[in-house]
Amino acid sequence: AQEIQEQKDELIMLLDSVKAANANTVYFQVRGRCDAMYKSSYEPWSSDLVATRGMDPGYDPLLFAVEEAHKRGIEIHAWFNPYRYESVLHQWDGTPQNYRESHPEWLLDYSDGSILNPAMPEVRDHITAIIQEVVQNYDIDGVVFDDYFYMSGTTDDMDDELYQQSNPDNLSRADWRRQNVNKLIAQVYRMIQSEKPYVRFGISPAGVWCTDATIAERYGVTPTPVGSDWAYDDIFCDPMAWIQEHSIDYISPQIYWTIGSSSDYTLIAEWWSQIVRQFGCHFYSSHSASDLSSAKMPSKYGKTTTGTLSFDLNGEKVSSKALSPIERKTAEENEYIVDGATASFKGSELVNQIKVNRTYDETGAPGSVFYNMRKVTHTSGMLSLLRSDVYKYPALIPAISWKATSDPGLVSNIAFTNGQL
């Protein structure tokens, strides 16, 4: 009971901090590795929540998060990793609802983990059903996917049989894999529209789409001006397809570089702003509070030997080993600092990035996303800086103007007392 209350108290503290910063939405991770931070009919309780995967925590964290967030006028988007299963092979052996026992054919194994196979219709149906249960049973405001699709290093032999059997359009293997991901995203979007069309669906992919002019020409767009094609070529992620097919409501690319770096934040943010205006979609730039280091600073830091990158964030040393695949990739593509050295960044970098977003978006930029909340709330002075500069006033959730909605009617049950609405 004490641990439950401690978890609830910590979440309330975080939500109060979000409210104090005049932010309006929280992405609450509900499924990290085919597990659940809510009462699921399909998958076990998450080991990030309890000591042993599958152990009942004694309460429903998602239900609690939704109730407390809504009390504060904050939206909750349920954050899913659609495919990721294990961070280490056979990690869940001996635990409840183990797919290695029930559906071993669903898994693609890599040296550093496993995922559900995006090529299998049964997998797409299963993931959609998992998300549908959350949409039906919880008063969430949105659904968001993280940056995990295929894992890097998918060899031909891993899916050759399916490629030969289920490729009626005779696509290249890479295009076929991207199509598999696109099918899931379109299927989830259709499900949400049929259940609760007001629930927003977004994805947070890598910050760079594709720099290949030939591929960009297929979509009638310009290529991303800087960066590499790692996400498009290696993990088979094609955000342009989702935007053009209108199978998402918003895109939140992880632009984890600083202004003036070799992959300049300004250039990438401007490009995404142009893309969403062209096709009709919201752009909520994802900013990294955990990975803004000298690895992404201008080249005055110089290149050095490889090694573990570390940086100092207001006195807290953070290792690159703790970063997500996209965070690690962005670090690899930029200038490293020497082993053991540290660098720091100021909150003003995030403020300036928000101002860049507003400069290039004709509506003042619908929004920004910060990864992760703890870094923002626990960095001394960060919340007050945001509130004193770019978030002086509370903001409404941006309207999705391209979707038909019913007239909500006149507002009722509202009062203004002592300066509070």
Task: Outline where the language-model segments fall.
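Aromatic-lined carbohydrate-binding/catalytic grooves of carbohydrate-active enzymes
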Residues: 21-57, 250
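Conserved aromatic anchor
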Residues: 419-421
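Polysaccharide-binding and catalytic clefts of secreted carbohydrate-active enzymes
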Residues: 7, 24, 95, 101-247, ...
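Active-site-adjacent "subsite" loops/lids of carbohydrate-active enzymes
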Residues: 1-8, 67, 78, 83-137, ...
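Structural preference for beta-strand elements that scaffold enzyme active sites
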Residues: 25-27, 73-79, 113, 141-144, ...
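Aromatic- and glycine-enriched glycan-recognition loops and surfaces
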Residues: 3-21, 48-72, 176-187
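Substrate-binding cleft of secreted/luminal carbohydrate-active enzymes
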Residues: 25, 236-262, 272-404
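Active-site beta-loop-alpha junctions enriched in small/polar residues
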Residues: 31-33, 81-85, 147-150, 206-208, ...
